[in-house]
Structures are given as structure tokens and as C-alpha cells.
UniProtKB/Swiss-Prot annotation:
A GO BP entry: mismatch repair
Entry's family note: Belongs to the RNase HII family.
Protein name (Swiss-Prot/TrEMBL): Ribonuclease HII
Organism: Thermosipho melanesiensis (strain DSM 12029 / CIP 104789 / BI429)
RNase H type-2 domain sequence ranges: 1-188
Length: 216
């Protein structure tokens, strides 16, 4: 039976996408474990080893999709996209996914602490983490005021202070706390009128804020 492991990176940040990976290993790879237990150097080295010795898929759900769907359903979307990419490379019989209460479009089983217990999930966690970190490094050049290369979008004290100083961006998750408390309604309406955020996302954010809709 061919088993695919699935995991994500980035459910907790205030900025950027959630990234998922799906992996079928071609052979056993020494040293694989939950990406959070590895150093940056170890993750990078294992990432290259996994890429060479597995079939893998990567999926994303954007900040906009997270605001529209909520983080749970956006995570499921990213995982389904990763599995769809993997499915184009190899057919698999079962999906093992880290966590609980995740409903995917494939025959699957949730494994609590699967990123430690199941090698395929561990491999997926490493790919997802490394890819998301690289995305944050890319975004750090576009949004240079926010030190994204350091905190990777997570709600650190430094990140919060930089938001307070420079304001929010459309790539922030605008339905997340404490973002909702820091969001300017005038800025939100400006983004909506300028088509920087679409109507569906605008409505979801307004609903979260509990204020009247503008021009909808």
C-alpha cells in the first residue's frame, strides 16, 4: 500500500499563506522528524534529501483565502492542492495527515503528533516549513519594514510593534486577532474601492469586525 503523508506550515502567523506538502517517500531517509525539532541547517539539508528521494506536492492558501474560509478550511484547501499535485506524479492508496478534525477530498486518517510518528508526515512538515520560510524571505523584500525574514509572519512582539508603526498590508490575515483590533476601517474601504481586496474578503472582514458594510 502506498501511503502519502501530509502536513502544513503557517497556521499561526498573522501574515502570508498557509503552506501544505504531501509526500510519498521512495526510500527511508535518516534523521527525518518534525520540522520544529530541527535546526535551520538540518531542515535545509533534509529538504534537499527529501526532494531527491520522494514524490511530493505543494499547496498554498493565501491570506485572502484564509480570511474568506477561516484557517481550518484554508488549511484543508492547501492540503488538497498539495495532494492533487502529488497525485499527478504517483497514485497513492491512503493519506495520513498530521493533526485532527481535518477533512480532505481523499481517503485519509488524522494522526495526532503524526509529524513525529510517521516519516511521510515528517517529510511533508519539513518541505512545508522550508518552502514557507522561503516565501517569507521573498515577501521581506517587498514589505521590508516588517522584518518578515526574522519572525516569518508569526505574532511576535517585534512584528506587532512594526505593524503599529507602519500599519497593515493586504498580505496580513485581516480576520485574525490582534489584527482586527489594529485594522483601520478607512484603510480597509480604500483597499476595497481600489480592488486590492475583493468583495467576498471585504464582507468577511467586515462581518468579523461587526461594522456596517460600505457600498455593497
Amino acid at each position: 500500500m502506498i501511503v502519502a503523508g501530509v502536513d502544513e506550515a503557517g497556521r499561526g502567523p498573522l501574515f502570508g499563506p498557509v503552506v501544505a506538502s504531501a509526500v510519498v517517500l521512495k526510500k527511508e531517509i535518516y534523521g527525518i522528524t518534525d520540522s520544529k525539532k530541527l535546526t535551520l541547517k538540518q531542515r535545509e539539508e533534509l529538504f534537499m534529501e527529501i526532494i531527491r528521494n520522494s514524490y511530493f506536492g505543494i499547496g498554498f492558501a493565501s491570506s485572502s483565502e484564509i480570511d474568506k474560509l477561516n484557517i481550518l478550511h484554508a488549511t484543508e484547501l492547501a492540503m488538497n492542492r498539495a495532494l492533487a499535485m502529488l497525485e499527478r506524479k504517483i497514485r497513492f492508496d491512503m493519506v495520513l495527515v498530521d493533526g485532527k478534525n481535518l477533512k480532505l477530498d481523499y481517503k485519509s486518517k488524522c494522526i495526532v503528533k503524526g509529524d513525529v510518528l510517521i516519516k511521510e508526515i515528517s517529510a511533508a512538515s519539513i518541505i512545508a516549513k522550508v518552502v514557507r520560510d522561503k516565501i517569507m524571505t521573498f515577501y521581506s523584500k517587498k514589505f521590508s519594514n516588517y522584518a518578515l525574514e526574522k519572525h516569518k509572519g508569526y505574532p511576535t512582539k517585534d512584528h506587532i510593534k512594526l505593524i503599529e508603526k507602519y500599519g497593515l498590508t493586504p498580505e496580513h490575515r485581516l480576520t485574525f486577532k490582534p489584527i482586527t483590533k489594529m485594522l483601520s476601517i478607512n484603510k480597509l474601504e480604500e483597499w476595497y474601492k481600489s480592488d486590492i481586496i475583493d468583495e467576498e474578503r471585504y464582507k468577511k472582514i467586515i462581518e468579523k469586525l461587526g461594522v456596517p458594510l460600505f457600498g455593497v
